[in-house]
Amino acid sequence: MKMKQLILTLCASLALISFSGIAKDIKIGMAIDDLRLERWQKDRDIFVSKAESLGAKVFVQSANGNEETQMSQIENMINRGVDVLVIIPYNGQVLSNVVAEAKREGIKVLAYDRMINNADIDFYISFDNEKVGEIQAQSLVEKVPQGNYFLMGGSPVDNNARLFRDGQMKVLKPFIDSGKIKVVGDQWVDGWLPENALKIMENALTANNNKIDAVVASNDATAGGAIQALSAQGLAGKVAISGQDADLAGIKRIMAGTQTMTVYKPITQLANTAAEVAVELGNDKQPKSDATLNNGLKEVPARLLTPIKVDKSNIESTVIKDGFHKKSDL
């Protein structure tokens, strides 16, 4: 009888040890480009809520648009012993060394919404960013099939900005080649900052004697800066302009008629899925992918979500219906 009791106790102890090994607390370090932007605040809140509901602990830091700060913050998270790094890079070209450091410590790395190039990352989640650019340009050529176009790219160190441009040019090139569209300027907006976009647009208007018919702006923040410059010349609402992110200010401008459209990327879906992927990585599981993208070093397994065009006609059926914005806020 004593032997039987001893065996049962031993089995229970082994089961407890086994269970403890499986149910480890996942620690996630979330390194964000710039929380001064409304867009990333939403991502953070949704991601943290979902990850915590899955039993993970999340440490968040914002680099405020500074690559050296971000590298230092990532190193700090490595030293804190996180299991997974979720990185929204300010500059996806400069993180290969710090990612290598993380990998040496056995830390998994998820690139969130922006690719990290030439680095041994484990997974990438984003939207189809070339498609974003196509949607932007297609919306403008439908409204302004010929005339003077100004191309306003995003941050020159953001890989996504290049992908947006690739998509835009797929649509614009035939119009440019036929002479229907003339590109009268092409500049990139450092840090995606509205104040930089404002200065660029002011200079573009001066250089072209205000003769600009459409502005291919790559997100709502830069569109907002450009529209400030257009407004000062009495051109707001007369010049077609694209956007992206469905920021509250951007949606309000669309309703007012000063911005033509935006691209809504259902952030709830992105952030929730990213949290699930991060926890899977932390548990040494391989998340399901629907694509692979080459980052210069390797083929990175990825999940790419579908972006949605939003203009005055479908605000209610998209961003309001999804709860991304409240109707009362508009």
Functional labels for PLM-detected ranges:
Residues 2, 15, 22-25:
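Generic N-terminal leader/processing signal
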Residues 9-18:
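Bacterial N-terminal signal peptides
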